[in-house]
Amino acid sequence: MTDKWLDTINWSADGLIPAIAQDKNNGKILMVAWMNREALKRTVESGEAVYWSRSRKKLWHKGEESGHTQKISAIHLDCDEDILLLSVEQKGGIACHTGRQSCFFRQLKNGEWVVTEPVIKDPSQIYTK
């Protein structure tokens, strides 16, 4: 396979594209992260999500420390070619570094952000570094 498919993507000025990870079984949005060309290429090659960490300025294989990897089921590109949707099988049921299933665990209710999702596992038990 050539890399021509990567040229279709409308990358941002800094060479990134947002990637939404969605649970393939129940459709729940798990997280949003960023990918550059190399991250997306490695994701396709490995079959597991690899993102670009904007804060650390390096590739990040999701679950490399926690074991909570994301097995890719499908990758979709939106109509404007500037957002990816990853259909994933979330290993361990935890996508968020807070120990929750989803990074979207707060909901706006009556002008307040309310936590609506429990911690599945304490992050101190997940991340030992």
UniProtKB/Swiss-Prot annotation:
Its cofactor is Mg(2+); Zn(2+). Pfam families: PRA-CH. It catalyses: 1-(5-phospho-beta-D-ribosyl)-5'-AMP + H2O = 1-(5-phospho-beta-D-ribosyl)-5-[(5-phospho-beta-D-ribosylamino)methylideneamino]imidazole-4-carboxamide. Homodimer. The lineage of its organism: Bacteria, Pseudomonadati, Pseudomonadota, Betaproteobacteria, Nitrosomonadales. One of its GO terms (biological process) is L-histidine biosynthetic process. It comes from Nitrosomonas europaea (strain ATCC 19718 / CIP 103999 / KCTC 2705 / NBRC 14298). Keywords: Amino-acid biosynthesis, Cytoplasm, Histidine biosynthesis, Hydrolase, Magnesium, Metal-binding, Zinc. It is found in: Cytoplasm. Pathway: Amino-acid biosynthesis; L-histidine biosynthesis; L-histidine from 5-phospho-alpha-D-ribose 1-diphosphate: step 3/9. Mg(2+) binds at D78, D80, D82. Its main location: cytoplasm. InterPro entries: PRA-CH (IPR026660), PRib_AMP_CycHydrolase_dom (IPR002496), PRib_AMP_CycHydrolase_sf (IPR038019). Belongs to the PRA-CH family. One of its GO terms (cellular component) is cytoplasm. The keyword GTP-binding does not apply. This is Phosphoribosyl-AMP cyclohydrolase. Catalyzes the hydrolysis of the adenine ring of phosphoribosyl-AMP. Gene3D superfamilies: Phosphoribosyl-AMP cyclohydrolase. Its EC number is 3.5.4.19. It is an enzyme of class 3 (hydrolase). Binds 1 Mg(2+) ion per subunit. GO terms for molecular function: magnesium ion binding; phosphoribosyl-AMP cyclohydrolase activity; zinc ion binding. Signal peptide: none annotated. Zn(2+) binds at C79, C96, C103.
